[in-house]
């Protein structure tokens, strides 16, 4: 495929704005030279960074706005103040207008979700979008969702997540019928609240040809790779994500302290440093950065707000991959196959609450 992938960036999003977004885009460009970028934000700050990255500068267009969404803005505040004028909105709107294939932002998650829903709308049959990400496991990678887009959710919502997540896994992992599990406090059918047990019953009744529902998965099953797709409502999913990232950093610090404690451990490290580097790379949260907003009429990727340039580059990579894999069309095909994979699910809400 020779066509360029057009990536819209909220250059003012996150804790560090253009000082991370632009270098991150430059790193991603080295891996995907068929990318081009639309950068939205303060042109003076953006151009200052672009001057340091001439290769990126050649394939970038800058669109000025001095209005940025704060990391502390409530979604309703962000919509009132930033609709049609903020760097976040303009990046998303570029996707709606067909000027970009994907939007990437490290900004406020709630504001980004609200703006994306308001601007792009949801797919038919999808009531609320979800944040999905690739989760490294001991048996490969899994798709995990929802990682914080929506707090709570009824059985129909969890069913929709399973359908979208399975479509994503099918595309990314080349699986004909990925396995799907519901995150729960136990694997027994009697465990969990009413909604999750009702969702399990719906998924069993579906007997979908597009995925295999394997039942409940406990928290430790995520890292074990118990299923190709792990489904959770956003509150529990976000806690699981942050706990895993914190644990990875904790183990890294423990290893660093242990390897520098005595001269013997330092010598041992010299012999085993390649193995430790491999472990560090595998556990680096930056390499799992980039959550995809599933269920929208467009592709939007959320980066961690406090990430580094390397971390933001991985989020841009995710956006690039979603376009190259034609994820949006594949999800649409899955939802529409056989008269609608979500048969009976109400159509999307037209407004953001």
Swiss-Prot record:
GO biological process, one term: phospholipid biosynthetic process
Glycoprotein in keyword set: no
Enzyme class (EC, first level): transferase
A GO CC term assigned to this protein in UniProt: cytoplasm
Keyword Ribosomal protein: no
Keywords annotated in UniProt: Cytoplasm, Lipid biosynthesis, Lipid metabolism, Phospholipid biosynthesis, Phospholipid metabolism, Transferase
Location in the cell: Cytoplasm
Taxonomy, superkingdom: Bacteria
EC number: 2.3.1.274
InterPro entries reported in the protein's UniProt record: FA_synthesis (IPR003664), Phospholipid_synth_PlsX-like (IPR012281)
Annotated pathway: Lipid metabolism; phospholipid metabolism
Primary localization class, coarse: cytoplasm
Catalyzed reactions per annotation: a fatty acyl-[ACP] + phosphate = an acyl phosphate + holo-[ACP]
Free-text function comment from the UniProt entry: Catalyzes the reversible formation of acyl-phosphate (acyl-PO(4)) from acyl-[acyl-carrier-protein] (acyl-ACP). This enzyme utilizes acyl-ACP as fatty acyl donor, but not acyl-CoA.
Subunit structure comment from the entry: Homodimer. Probably interacts with PlsY.
Protein name, UniProt field: Phosphate acyltransferase
Organism for this UniProt entry: Rhodopseudomonas palustris (strain BisB18)
